[in-house]
């Protein structure tokens, strides 16, 4: 989608921009593919906060997305491109030859009226889903499975993609957008192309209210809290941390401290780690 700039009629609108929704062809979602979406404000079943800075936001309904793409050898026609408030990418409404409807993440270049298909014998074209072993080396892909049949988990956000680098027996090598190269089972599926709506990275919210609409609450610095609320808190006026290392609200080392387990089973599938900043090397 293109970017629409607003006039500076107020201070909040001075640098604000938004989508022009030029690619959106249908404004009302398909009722049969909706599900209720309960907002928990970051609380668990006991009412304890498990994720901070969550709460509020506009009411939404969940769009049921087909991440598995296991309806093989049945062509589907793209009937509409829709906006999904629950993700950064747009979604495409598919109608299969047998009348079944489903949503998929809309890849870049997918238009209304185009035909897509899934299965081992599907063509290598945008929107088709195949097992990784059937995709040529060098192809750009998205919505990549990590376990066969579980559904795509990697490269699903707006503008995201990965590249198939090579094949080794029952595994293939995939380079992710972070620069990480990892082995994935060749029987896992992926979709051809790049996720659409890559202009999402250019969006400027302009005011705090747009962040609140998304259900995000203010992120307060520890240095401006009291000592009983955060290890960085307290002191007269602005004070340094006063510790050998910055700490989380619960006293754990943070900012550069590696948190990934050395015993994680998936470590053996990472051929080359992702690119990191100088403070984490």
Swiss-Prot record:
CC per GO annotation: large ribosomal subunit
GO BP of this protein: cytoplasmic translation
Nucleotidyltransferase as UniProt keyword: no
Domain of life the protein comes from: Bacteria
InterPro entries recorded: NA-bd_OB-fold, Rib_uL2_dom2, Ribosomal_uL2, Ribosomal_uL2_bac/org-type, Ribosomal_uL2_C, Ribosomal_uL2_CS, Ribosomal_uL2_dom3, Ribosomal_uL2_RNA-bd_dom
Entry's Gene Ontology molecular function annotations: rRNA binding; structural constituent of ribosome; transferase activity
Family assignment from sequence similarity: Belongs to the universal ribosomal protein uL2 family.
Oligomer and partners: Part of the 50S ribosomal subunit. Forms a bridge to the 30S subunit in the 70S ribosome.
Identification of the protein by name: Large ribosomal subunit protein uL2
Organism: Limosilactobacillus reuteri (strain DSM 20016)
Underlying gene: rplB
């Amino acid at each position: 989608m293109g970017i629409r700039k607003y006039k500076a009629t107020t201070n909040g609108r001075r640098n604000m921009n938004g989508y022009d929704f030029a690619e959106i062809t249908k404004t009302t979602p398909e009722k049969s593919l909706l599900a209720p979406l309960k907002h928990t404000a970051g609380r668990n079943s006991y009412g304890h906060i498990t994720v901070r800075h969550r709460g509020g936001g506009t009411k939404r309904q969940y769009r049921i997305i087909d991440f598995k793409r296991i309806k093989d050898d049945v062509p589907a026609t793209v009937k509409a491109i829709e906006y999904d408030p629950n993700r950064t990418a747009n979604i495409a409404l598919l109608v299969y030859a047998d009348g079944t409807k489903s949503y998929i993440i809309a890849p870049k270049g997918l238009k209304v009226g185009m035909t897509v298909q899934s299965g081992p014998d599907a063509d290598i074209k945008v929107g088709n889903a195949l097992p990784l072993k059937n995709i040529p080396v060098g192809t750009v892909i998205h919505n990549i499975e990590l376990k066969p049949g579980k559904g795509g988990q990697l490269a699903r956000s707006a503008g995201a993609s990965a590249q198939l680098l090579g094949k080794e027996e029952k595994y293939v090598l995939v380079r992710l957008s972070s620069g990480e190269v990892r082995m994935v089972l060749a029987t896992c599926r992926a979709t051809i192309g790049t996720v659409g709506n890559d202009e999402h990275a250019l969006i400027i919210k302009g005011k705090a209210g747009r962040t609140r609409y998304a259900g995000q609450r203010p992120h307060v610095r520890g240095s401006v809290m009291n000592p009983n609320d955060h290890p960085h808190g307290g002191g007269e006026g602005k004070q340094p941390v006063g510790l050998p290392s910055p700490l989380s609200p619960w006293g754990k080392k943070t900012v550069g401290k590696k948190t990934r387990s050395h015993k994680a089973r998936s470590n053996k599938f990472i051929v080359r780690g992702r690119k990191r900043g100088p403070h984490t090397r």
